[in-house]
Design a protein with these regions (language model features):
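Ligand-binding loop in jelly-roll beta-barrel domains
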Residues: 83-108
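Conserved short histidine dyad/triad with adjacent acidic residue
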Residues: 18, 33-48
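Short, conserved beta-strand element in jelly-roll/cupin
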Residues: 37-38, 47-64
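A short, N-terminal "cap"/entry segment at the start of jelly-roll beta-barrel domains
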Residues: 1-31, 113-128
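Short acidic-glycine-tyrosine-enriched beta hairpin
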Residues: 69-83
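Structural motif
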Residues: 61-63, 70, 86, 95
Length: 128
């Protein structure tokens, strides 16, 4: 595979926690997720020992906790989390959407969810 592209709305979305929906796509070294939270959503504190995470909010607002610091992220705002940094989050109201980028990619991006591949069907992808 040299490269590919797809539309988020054409990829499968999975509910990975209550009211927390993920659409995943991956390259050789980078995983990208579209996350959609419907209030109320809570993601417990966790960390990623094997990758750095970038969060880019595109719709709505979320409360993000990084170590002992809590702040609101709004559309256009970005947070970058080095490996092993404890973080979590919760919804404020309504619906929020953000993009997560993981480098290197995580196993969740490679395997997809509930045993299905997160990779798009090659017949449905336009080469770039």
């Amino acid at each position: 595979m040299s490269s590919f592209r797809a539309r988020w709305d054409d990829l499968p979305e999975r509910e990975v926690l209550t009211n927390n929906f993920r659409t995943a796509m991956t390259g050789k070294e980078t995983g990208v997720n579209r996350i959609r939270w419907i209030h109320p959503t809570v993601v417990p504190t966790h960390s990623h020992p094997d990758c750095e995470q970038t969060v880019i909010v595109t719709e709505g607002k979320i409360i993000f906790t990084v170590e002992d610091d809590e702040f609101t992220l709004e559309p256009g705002e970005i947070a970058i989390l080095p490996r092993n940094v404890p973080h979590g989050g919760r919804s404020i109201e309504g619906e929020a959407e953000f993009i997560e980028i993981f480098a290197p990619t995580r196993i969740e991006n490679l395997l997809g969810f509930v045993g299905s591949s997160s990779m798009p069907d090659p017949d449905e992808v336009t080469g770039a």
